[in-house]
Amino acid sequence: SAASDVYKRQDGYVIVSVAWVTFSLFGMLPYYIGGYIPSVTDAFFETMSGFSSTGATILNNIESMPHGILFWRAMTQWIGGLGIVFFTIAVLPIFGVGGIQVFAAEASGPTHDKVHPRIGITAKWIWGIYAGMTGTLIVLLVFGGMSVFDSICHAFTTTSTGGFSTKQASIEYYHSPYICLLYTSPS
């Protein structure tokens, strides 16, 4: 019935909202417990910015952070690029809420047509493409002179369109026309 569909869609919105807050509360722990971001609100903001691929940051001396924190920061954006949506789609059926309701809560625009008859298969295809794009960019950045660590972090944040960097000056730090071309060339 129509009322049942609205109720399920509302459930999807609530579950997505709770998932974002929950992931961010747990995701802020490395920053806060490690003392790298001593304010709870700042640590939460940095994490929410990562998981939402927003790219806003409260950090003003990025290069002073240890590699583990920089990797976690990049990973939050990579996970946020697609991960939370598809994790939720894969896990929610266990709790009796279908993945389509959650997809509708996250998707913009009309959602009358299904992406694929089986959302799980679609999610696997999208994850494969996402991982492939990330891997390709890692190789291209290493080829351009970035360290493996910086290449991984930048590929994570670029693929997700979040834009966090391991350097205060972002890609300008490298003074590389090749790297700039990778970031500015049309797809």
Question: Which functions belong to the PLM regions below?
Answer:
Residues 8, 12, 66-73, 110-122, ...:
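Membrane-helix interfacial "entry" motifs
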Residues 98-119, 155-165:
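Juxtamembrane inter-helical linkers in multi-pass membrane proteins
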Residues 1, 24-28, 88-91, 133-142, ...:
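Hydrophobic core segments of alpha-helical transmembrane domains in multi-pass membrane transport
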Residues 26-80, 143-185:
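P-loop potassium selectivity filter motif centered on the GYG triad
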Residues 2-10, 183-187:
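Conserved small/polar residues in nucleotide/adenosyl-binding loops
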Residues 117-150, 156:
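Long, contiguous internal "core" modules enriched in hydrophobic/ aromatic residues
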Residues 8-21, 120-132:
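Alpha-helical transmembrane segments and their helix-start/interface "positive-inside/aromatic belt" motifs
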Residues 76-98, 185:
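Transmembrane alpha-helical segments in integral membrane proteins
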